[in-house]
Design a protein with these regions (language model features):
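Conserved ABC ATPase "signature" region
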Residues: 16-32
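Catalytic Walker B motif of ABC-type/P-loop ATPase nucleotide-binding domains
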Residues: 61-64
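Conserved ABC ATPase signature
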Residues: 36-40
């Protein structure tokens, strides 16, 4: 996992403090840094992907079922992270079947049915 983050940090000029902050914000700690991503749990993989977005300073996050594989507290932490990202002018596109949670996070909503937009609000 550390190599993955270091690669992206190099690409954008992020330093060790920014990597550590991204890991903390994503709910990860240094104990997992030597673990290969393929050996991580589903929730840890999602958190690693979020840490990469944070290190990359991505202006757009495309999250497909981001709450899958997370326990209830992990889902709440992810929601907090999404809210912080949006407050920092990050655009978040969230694809989810959890409509209640998505609506609580959304500034705008688009429903897709059969591959076409069926509702926009």
């Amino acid at each position: 996992m550390a190599e993955n983050l270091a690669f992206w940090a190099d690409m954008v000029g992020a330093n060790e403090a920014e990597i550590a902050a991204a890991l903390t914000s994503a709910g990860l700690d240094g104990r997992l840094s030597s673990v290969r991503v393929s050996a991580l749990s589903a929730g840890q993989r999602r958190r690693t992907a979020l840490a990469v977005l944070l290190v990359r300073r991505a202006e757009l996050w495309l999250l497909d079922e981001p709450h899958a594989g997370l326990d209830p507290s992990g889902r709440d932490e992810l929601d907090d992270l999404i809210r912080l990202a949006v407050a920092s002018d990050v655009t978040v596109i969230l694809a989810s079947h959890d409509l209640e949670r998505s609506r609580a996070l959304a500034g705008r909503e688009i429903a897709v049915k059969g591959g076409t937009v069926s509702e926009a609000a």
